Curated annotation (Swiss-Prot):
Residues 135-145, 171-180 have a biased composition (Basic and acidic residues). Residues 130-149, 165-186, 208-248 are annotated as: Disordered. This is Myeloid leukemia factor 2. InterPro entries: Myeloid_leukemia_factor (IPR019376). It comes from Homo sapiens (Human). The modification Phosphoserine is found at S217, S238, S240. One of its GO terms (biological process) is regulation of DNA-templated transcription. Keywords: Cytoplasm, Nucleus, Phosphoprotein. Belongs to the MLF family. Its main location: cytoplasm.
Length: 248
């Protein structure tokens, strides 16, 4: 019933039987340079060092497979192959030293058994990178079942990193802050943060994200004023599309 996802033209009478044909066709042309340009040239010098052509697996026609849409030797398996090729090209462009990248992934789990409020788990991971081994990582977790809300932000320069993690439980009111250092001593944290800000200022004329520390006030504490701003801007940071941030 279903075929391998392969190059077909809209006038092909079997075209409508392949629900992913248009998507696969566009992806194949992008990866093989069929459009004659790259969406990443605007942030490079116009060259595409290290990019790879689409694999033969993407361009070859396949055979009829009744299990194709179940992800067995066709269908989604071919989509995974195309995505792997795209990720590989992204890695090669980043290694070229003249490219900024942004990636984001989100997982959401929803459960409603009918006896109480629905249970929702959401986890989002983001990464921004710039030449020179500069990266900013961000991970947020929300779990309605346990009441946990957690956010961690990491600043990386090659193999060194300073990671700040904050969590709170909106049911119990408990809050926790933790800082991790990779190939750094705690005494070097301030100098590392200054270096990270200097490096990122070359790519964006805007105050980079700063770690806001809780200031002790007796048994409790208060947080610094002002929302964080990311040094390496991603698509969701545009004025027309502001994502929700956890500002604790």
């Amino acid at each position: 019933m279903f075929r391998f996802m392969r190059d077909v033209e809209p006038e092909d009478p079997m075209f409508l039987m392949d629900p992913f044909a248009i998507h696969r066709q566009h992806m194949s042309r992008m990866l093989s340079g069929g459009f004659g340009y790259s969406p990443f040239l605007s942030i490079t010098d116009g060259n595409m060092p290290g990019t790879r052509p689409a694999s033969r697996r993407m361009q070859q026609a396949g055979a009829v497979s009744p299990f194709g849409m179940l992800g067995m030797s066709g269908g989604f398996m071919d989509m995974f192959g195309m995505m792997n090729d795209m990720i590989g090209n992204m890695e090669h462009m980043t290694a070229g030293g003249n490219c900024q990248t942004f990636s984001s992934s989100t997982v959401i789990s929803y459960s409603n058994t009918g006896d109480g409020a629905p249970k929702v788990y959401q986890e989002t991971s983001e990464m921004r990178s710039a030449p020179g081994g500069i990266r900013e990582t961000r991970r947020t977790v929300r779990d309605s079942d346990s009441g946990l809300e957690q956010m961690s932000i990491g600043h990386h320069i090659r193999d060194r990193a300073h990671i700040l993690q904050r969590s709170r439980n909106h049911r119990t009111g408990d809050q926790e802050e933790r800082q991790d250092y990779i190939n750094l001593d705690e005494s070097e944290a301030a100098a590392f943060d200054d270096e990270w800000r200097r490096e990122t200022s070359r790519f964006r004329q805007q105050r980079p994200l700063e770690f806001r520390r809780l200031e002790s006030s007796g048994a409790g504490g208060r947080r610094a004023e002002g929302p964080p701003r990311l040094a390496i801007q991603g698509p969701e940071d545009s004025p027309s599309r502001q994502s929700r941030r956890y500002d604790w």
